[in-house]
């Protein structure tokens, strides 16, 4: 249980259904979401904000923008369900807001996988986020 709490605090975006988001990232990238993305660049994880450092960091920036576009639900609290079929994330909600929330998380997981080649260890564990340059608005 403690491991899940730590994961919830450090995950990319720190919002939404953190357990599901973490599972999606692990399934798509094969990387531990906490240790690989919990404090990556300027936008992944806690206090994430600023001009993206690379394509991987941009995935997290776009994810935060996706959450900002949601209406009628609470990305910080609402939970959704999804399945993993044939190495594909399938969002399984009838509620439109929860489906959109799931789609935001699915998109970031896929984006992180597609940009694994841009992952730069020098941006991992970036606890200097207050020094990140201001990003353009979503």
Curated annotation (Swiss-Prot):
Subcellular localization(s) per the UniProt record: Secreted
MF terms (GO), sorted A to Z: calcium ion binding; calcium-dependent phospholipase A2 activity; phospholipid binding; toxin activity
Record-annotated site: Cationic membrane-docking site (MDoS): 129, 134
Taxonomic lineage of the native organism: Eukaryota, Metazoa, Chordata, Craniata, Vertebrata
Assembly and binders: Homodimer; non-covalently linked.
UniProt superkingdom: Eukaryota
Protein name (database record): Basic phospholipase A2 homolog M1-3-3
UniProt organism field: Bothrops asper
Site (Hydrophobic membrane-disruption site (MDiS)): 128, 131
Site-annotated residues for Important residue of the cationic membrane-docking site (MDoS): 121, 124
Signal peptide range in chain numbering: 1-16
Key words, A-Z: Disulfide bond, Myotoxin, Secreted, Signal, Toxin
Tissue spec: Expressed by the venom gland.
GO cellular component, one term: extracellular region
Function: Snake venom phospholipase A2 homolog that lacks enzymatic activity. Is myotoxic. A model of myotoxic mechanism has been proposed: an apo Lys49-PLA2 is activated by the entrance of a hydrophobic molecule (e.g. fatty acid) at the hydrophobic channel of the protein leading to a reorientation of a monomer. This reorientation causes a transition between 'inactive' to 'active' states, causing alignment of C-terminal and membrane-docking sites (MDoS) side-by-side and putting the membrane-disruption sites (MDiS) in the same plane, exposed to solvent and in a symmetric position for both monomers.
Coiled coil segments of this chain: none
SMART domains with a match to the protein in the record: PA2c
One GO BP annotation of this record: phospholipid metabolic process
Main localization (coarse): secreted
Keyword tRNA-binding assigned: no
Keyword Heme among UniProt keywords: no
